[in-house]
């Protein structure tokens, strides 16, 4: 229920401040929403598919600060994440302290970035909430640290402040190596929304297809390397039924096609009306779509696609509000109904892919104050491959 309440409130704020352009209380409401999202994620209890894996790591695989070794500080072990866990563990903290720190860090920077680049902040936050919020705060906590830091590295690259940009990328990589992809951003800074970029997006599908063919044998080789952790993990990605299901046309139509098609059509139609803030972000928007398309054939690319998805959400927020405002000759209710009909497939797709399809991982919501054990959720997550789970010990959490 708490998820629906937040979504409903965000929709009301979208109408009041983005569509009807009220100003009174705008900053205060933005801050209240930020605090609410921090607390919901920070005070959760065993909510999210990977939360119990993080819990296991914290209590059974985290040394005290004085016991950290050189191996703990290697890039592959996400040293800044290890240091954070060790610090909290050393001072006698519980794991939900880590959750609050991560949630505050990630959401504050996301909200700051949205406010910096998007005119319609509540609409963008709504899209963030239904598409990336649960992912960043429960499933990929380590990577989320790196991603939000590297978003600001992209801004420095636009200003040609390379030293600051790559310093932030180094910090991001120390949280999770996957964000190394941001280091290659300068190669794509000349991209613009035009016919060439549309052709590039079409080409990215065939690039993904070629990678899928060439990487298939490599994944089989990794699978045969029984002692190799990376091999085991990649092999499990390939054999996990949910990932196999993602490769089918049915799931691609539900999960991926709407955001790709809506983004291309809406932004291309409104490209001459984009604000200067958005025009600066064109390269990242196109990169995000390209990775999204490549993930249709190479599912592990969804990790990179999620790193750039915030740019797609910023552009979508602008185009949706702009299209609705263009209907002012119509009655307000008629204009809103038209927008609802036009964009409901997109919203439903985002909701289905995050909060509906795997709802057993997140619903019902439980907090550290009640600490309820949801048997259905526990059975589900304990049967997930490639994850070790700790027992549901209320006192330990």
What are these regions (language model features)?
Residues 138-150, 154, 175, 264-324:
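Membrane-water interface signatures at transmembrane helix termini and the short loops
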Residues 47, 52-56, 64-68, 186, ...:
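Alpha-helical transmembrane segments and terminal signal-anchor/GPI-anchor hydrophobic tails
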């Amino acid at each position: 229920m708490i998820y629906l309440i937040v979504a409903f409130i965000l929709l009301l704020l979208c109408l009041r401040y983005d569509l009807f352009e009220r100003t009174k209380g705008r900053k205060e409401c933005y801050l209240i929403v930020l605090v609410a999202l921090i607390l919901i994620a920070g005070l959760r209890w065993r909510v999210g598919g990977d939360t119990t894996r993080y819990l296991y790591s914290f209590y059974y695989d985290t040394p005290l600060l004085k016991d950290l070794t050189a191996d703990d500080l290697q890039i592959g072990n996400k040293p800044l994440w290890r240091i954070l866990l060790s610090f909290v563990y050393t001072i006698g903290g519980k794991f939900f302290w880590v959750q609050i720190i991560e949630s505050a860090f990630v959401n504050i920077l996301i909200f700051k970035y949205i406010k910096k680049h998007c005119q319609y902040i509540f609409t963008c936050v709504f899209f963030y909430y239904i598409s990336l919020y649960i992912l960043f705060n429960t499933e990929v906590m380590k990577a989320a640290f790196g991603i939000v830091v590297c978003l600001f590295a992209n801004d420095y690259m636009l200003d040609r402040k390379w030293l600051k940009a790559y310093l932030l990328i180094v910090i991001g990589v120390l949280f999770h190596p996957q964000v190394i992809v941001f280091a290659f951003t300068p190669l794509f800074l000349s991209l613009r929304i035009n016919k060439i970029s549309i052709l590039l997006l079409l080409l990215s599908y065939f690039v993904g297809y070629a990678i899928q063919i060439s990487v298939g044998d490599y994944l089989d080789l990794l699978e045969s390397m029984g002692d190799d952790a990376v091999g085991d993990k990649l092999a499990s990605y390939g054999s996990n039924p949910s990932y196999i299901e993602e490769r089918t046309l049915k799931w691609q139509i539900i999960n991926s096609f709407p955001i790709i098609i809506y983004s291309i059509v809406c932004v291309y139609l409104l490209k001459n009306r984009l604000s200067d803030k958005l025009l600066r972000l064109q390269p990242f928007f196109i990169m995000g779509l390209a990775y999204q398309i490549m993930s249709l054939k190479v599912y592990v690319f969804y990790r990179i696609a999620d790193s750039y998805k915030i740019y797609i959400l910023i552009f979508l927020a602008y185009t949706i509000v702009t299209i609705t405002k263009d209907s002012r000759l119509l009655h307000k209710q008629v204009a809103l109904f038209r927008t609802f009909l036009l964009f409901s497939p997109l919203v439903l797709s985002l909701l289905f892919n995050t909060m509906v399809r795997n709802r057993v991982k997140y619903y019902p919501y439980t907090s550290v104050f009640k600490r309820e054990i949801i048997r259905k959720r526990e059975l589900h997550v304990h049967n997930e491959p490639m994850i070790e789970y700790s027992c549901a010990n209320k006192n330990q959490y």
